[in-house]
Each structure stands twice: as structure tokens, then as C-alpha cells.
């Protein structure tokens, strides 16, 4: 899509092939010296390049014939065709509700009538989901129309309209290793790739090549939306390095199907995203991605109960309340629930859903001591009758002032695949956009890409994959602000800081009415920046921008601001 607006600034240049933007990245270093905590504002000048040409995007789904795969394909077709259908509650029209890029907005700034909001998708040139070309693999041989009927997600009238299109779509055979998924999946596995592990990986590579050739797409992204696998052991000499992982595949040692798909995708230069909770990205797979400069991301779609948890925990801890018990119960009846009824597969999901609160707990040492965290229990049960309409019940108990207790109880009915499908779209759209963004600091000679472990996808994942040694962020609004502010940086715009000083002064702030000039760095509060949701005025000036680097420790000592 072409740009819907242009930034008027000497720091932004719309060149023939790229948008070039100069950007001052303001951070805050905190260190201790002779018993005094020193706080030092820092600024680094970046130059961003964003390619303006939007490619024709192909997406290959592992598990294309499953509930998520059929639903996201049906949704894109219905939107592309402009379909509508009747239900008992009235007429429904195809939409992309639930997609960050298609159905939410970002604030550009303020105008004569107040704040100006634009669709998130309009911040930078992006692929429109209507233009995505789908393909993929499945262990079940059903065409997508029959698989859609089996899934029982969409209303019958829309299924009837889509059947002529979807019955022509048939998944390619997939890799099936019974040991990695529940035994109850065996009756679906009538469409599998035979041969050694090396031959199976080679077949996946040939499938990717064939799809590129026959569909005429410019690039391909591969996404795993198949069954949850059991966890893999990290074994020295098997999957601890890229070379060992490739040798393990050659020698037929233990390598999960999801990791085999990752290896094939990486070797074909295709970004690979893991939408399930298992540890697909063993150290060898990550090293292989880094060596080949290919993006990988995951893990596990953050769609319903866990997304609410990342909001509610952020609220409770930020409000100074102390959650001490979180009990999360689910029951669902789709094939995901059937597979998760096996203990090893459930354990993968339990780990993914349990770690979502860690960064919020660690952010407040006033409430939590070392190694202290809430009791956290996750239960998932398989109830076939409820199908894709997952029920989630949560109880949050928090300690409040003077020994009191506060309990919040939630009941959440999650249409599982209808919540996951827009997340699939956002994952591939954001990954594709990041492939067109490069940047450098003023001391760099060459532009670089993002790290191969694409942590900007964290907003969309239960268990975010991040580069080694970097913080894992689960708090919902911090994750969202990260995406928005990086996209703003590509346009030379200051990050959202929500100060709104122009509305808090007795006399008018005249300088806000003209283009800002370089300001001297101002003292930055020692208080932690708030986690607002990004729907307000942009930063007032680079010198006053809220920095992100005060860290997670509250230190009882004198604080000195260095300018």
C-alpha cells in the first residue's frame, strides 16, 4: 500500500526506493558509584531506511487444514471477495477485527480538532492481507472446504459461499512423527511425507521452491499453526549448534517436526514463525537462523486468556497491588484441546501460559522479594461439545492495604480460531515489514537489519522469543508501544510519551506550534515511565522524550542526574 500521509521534516526524506529518516534514540543509563546511583541520559543518532515497494507475499502454513489454517484462509478470501451472510442476529460482513494492523489505530499527533488517529497499517507501506497468497502442509488429506466444515468455526452461510474457492485448495503432505504429538492424532495422519529426516527436510525445501515458482510471489514466510508438540531435550552434540542439528537430521536423531520445518525454511531464506508453545527453536536452530540472516519468531499465539492476563497483571502491579494467586482454568473441544489432553503436550502449553507474568513481577521489588512470585496454576481440559468456543475462567487474588485481600474472577468465552487468525496475519505482516527495514548509527558504515530473533513480535506471542541476554517483556502495553514507536522511528517521529504538557500549563507553550528544534537534554524523572496504550499525543521533543532504561530495580540510595 502506498503512503497515506507524509512527514514534513528535514529529518525525513522520501527517496525513490526508500523512506529515509534520521532519529535520535534517547535512553537512560543507571549505574552505582561510591554509594550513589548515577542516572545519565544518553542519545544515539540512527538513520532508518524503509523500502517503499510492497512485495507480493506468500504464506505457507504448517497445519493448513487445521482450525486456524482454514479460518485465516477463509477470512482473507471473504474479505477479498467482500462477502456478507445472515445469522440469527442479523447480517454479518467480512472484516479483520482482532488485527492490530487492520483494526486498530495509532495517534500521529494533534490537529485543530484534537488528536489525529490513523489506521496502524498506514504508518508505513505494508502488505494488505487481501493480497496474501496461501499454501501449506497438513497431515490430513482433506481439502480446505471439507477441513473448514470439520472445524465448525464459521457460520454455514459463509462456508457455502467459500466452498467453491476452498475445495480447490489442498494441503501438501506433512511430516508426522507420532512421538511428538498425542496418540489421538493418528486417525488424522493420512497425508504424510515418508523417508528419512533428511529426505523429509529436502521435500519441504522443494515444496517451498515449487510454491515460489508456481504462485509468482516475491517472498515466502512459513508459519507453524499445527499441533502442539512435546518439549525436546537440549542434547549436546545433537541440537546445541547449527552444525550438530544438521548432522542430527542427516543421522536420523531426535529432531521435532517443527524444528525440521524451521531448518528447511531457514535454508530456503524464508522467515519462520512458531505459533505453538513447544521449544522449536533449539540452540542449533537459532544459530542456523543467525548464520543465514533469516528472521525467526514465536512462540505460541497470544490470543485470549493469556492476552487478558498480560493486561490485568500489568494493571495490578502498576497500581501497587500484590497479586499472590492466579488460577487459570480452560476447557475446549477442538482438535487443539484433544491434542493437549495428552500430558506431554499439555506441559508445553502450561509452561507457555505460566511465564507470562514474570517480567511484571520482577518490575516491582517493593511488592516482591527475591525469587518471590504469585502462586500460578494453569488447567486445560478437553470437552468435545464446546468445540472451538473455548471457556476460560480466572481467579486473581491480590494483597491490598493493611492485610486486606482483593479477588477478581473472570469468565471469558474465546472463539479460539477467530482470535488466533488475525494474530497469524499480524505476525506475517510485521515480519515482512521488518524485512524491508534497515538502520545504522552515526558511527556505522553499513546498514543492518534487525536481529534474526525478531523480538518485536512479542506482542503477539505468549512466550516471546528474544535474543540471548535480552529482557523478555510480556506486559501488553509495553509490547504494543514497542511496535508503534519503532514504526514512528522509521518516520523520524518521537516516541509516544503521553506527557501532554501543552494541556498542563498556565501559559501557552508557543514552541509546540512550530517545528521543534534540537533541545538540550532535560532531567528525567527517577520514576518508572507509565505504560499507557499509545492512543495519545506524540512526544513533544526529543529532549523531553520518556526514556525506557531506568531498569527494574528500586535502589535505596541517593540519586544524581548527570547532564
UniProtKB/Swiss-Prot annotation:
Pathway: Polyol metabolism; myo-inositol biosynthesis; myo-inositol from D-glucose 6-phosphate: step 1/2. GO terms for molecular function: inositol-3-phosphate synthase activity. It comes from the Eukaryota. It catalyses: D-glucose 6-phosphate = 1D-myo-inositol 3-phosphate. GO terms for biological process: inositol biosynthetic process; phospholipid biosynthetic process. Its main location: cytoplasm. It is an enzyme of class 5 (isomerase). One of its GO terms (cellular component) is cytoplasm. It holds the Pfam family Inos-1-P_synth. InterPro entries: Myo-inos-1-P_Synthase (IPR002587), Myo-inos-1-P_Synthase_GAPDH (IPR013021), NAD(P)-bd_dom_sf (IPR036291). Its EC number is 5.5.1.4. Keywords: Cytoplasm, Inositol biosynthesis, Isomerase, Lipid biosynthesis, Lipid metabolism, NAD, Phospholipid biosynthesis, Phospholipid metabolism. Its cofactor is NAD(+). Key enzyme in myo-inositol biosynthesis pathway that catalyzes the conversion of glucose 6-phosphate to 1-myo-inositol 1-phosphate in a NAD-dependent manner. Rate-limiting enzyme in the synthesis of all inositol-containing compounds. Belongs to the myo-inositol 1-phosphate synthase family. This is Inositol-3-phosphate synthase 1-A. It comes from Xenopus laevis.
